[in-house]
Structure formats: C-alpha cells, structure tokens
Amino acid sequence: MKLLFLHGLEGSPRGQKPSWLRDAGHDVIAPDLDTYDVRSHLETWFAAGRPEVTMPPAAWSIPLATAQAALSTPGIDAVVGSSFGGGLAMELVRLGLWRGPLLLLAPAGRKLFGITTVEVSRLAILHGRHDDVVPLEDSVALARDAHADATLRIVDDDHRLTASVAAGLMGELLTVLVPPMRP
C-alpha cells in the first residue's frame, strides 16, 4: 500500500511510526515537514498564557506546501497523520486536496487548526486515553461528526502511541481503511 505519512511536531520522516509502516511492507512517502515555525509560534503562545491555540495559516504554510507537494505523488492509497501531521492532513481535506482514506493518530486538527470535521471516503482514528497533549474528546467528536465511514480506536496509551504502534494497531486500522485486494 502506498501511504503519505505526515509526522508530528516532535516526529520526523525517519521516526518510529513511518519506520514501522515501512517494515510492515508499505511504500511510505514521509516528507520532512520543517515544523520550526510552528513550534516557535506555539512556544510564543504558551509563554503568553494562551493554552487554547488555533494557529494562523502563516505558521504552518511551509509544512502545508510540503504536504501538498508530497500528495501529488501518483498512486497514494491513504494518508496517515500523527498529531500535528493529523491536523495537517485534516487541512488537506478541508482544502479539497484529499478525499480518500485517512488514518489519524491523536490528531491535533481541532486544537491547532480549528478543524472539527472531515469529508473523506473512510476515516480511522487511533487515540490514547492517557494523552496529555491532544484531548481525547476531540477525536471522539471528530469520529461522531465526520462525513465518512469512521472507526475510532481508544487505547490504553499516551500521546505518542508507542505501545499501540508496536502492537500493530496502525496496520489493523489501515486494513480497515483500505482492505486488501482479492485475487
């Protein structure tokens, strides 16, 4: 399966999640989203005592352009986004650039982008009940309100979802999103 993977603020194209996907046999396109401006913006907002953040588009224009360029790769079967990358994937959907299967891992779409719903063919969300970065309630509402066939998997994990990824839950959800072709 050909996947576009969009990493989080602390992630990278060579991080645990895209590496696991590659090791599982997927063709993974994982661009470096260059999140420096986003992190700087968030540090400024949090230092000013603003816990709820919806970032202005200028703060994420570079990662968005990078994601758009990667999305133009022919044959992408699904988009996978983790935290900030999940919010960025939701922005691609909001802009009408992607309508296919979408796997979101603790997505920061509402928290950082102000996006509360998506219109895609299929949606799967993996979120840890012990996440102290992105509210679990955001994913519950997204799954409930999505204009898509949605699956929400709440797991006994934290924001990084390390145990869940190691247990193969990303792969299980991808199989739900894009069922294997029958011979």
Language model segments and positions:
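Serine-hydrolase catalytic machinery in alpha/beta-hydrolase-like enzymes
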Residues: 1-78, 87-91
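Conserved alpha/beta-hydrolase fold motif
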Residues: 78-80, 102
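Short beta-strand/loop motif that positions the catalytic acidic residue
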Residues: 119, 124-127, 131
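Short alpha-helix in the alpha/beta-hydrolase fold that links the catalytic acid
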Residues: 17-18, 135-144, 166-167
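Acidic catalytic loop of the alpha/beta-hydrolase fold
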Residues: 11-12, 129-134, 159-160
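Catalytic histidine neighborhood in serine/cysteine hydrolases
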Residues: 29, 144-161
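Post-His helix in hydrolase/transferase enzymes
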Residues: 162-177
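A conserved short beta-strand
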Residues: 98-110
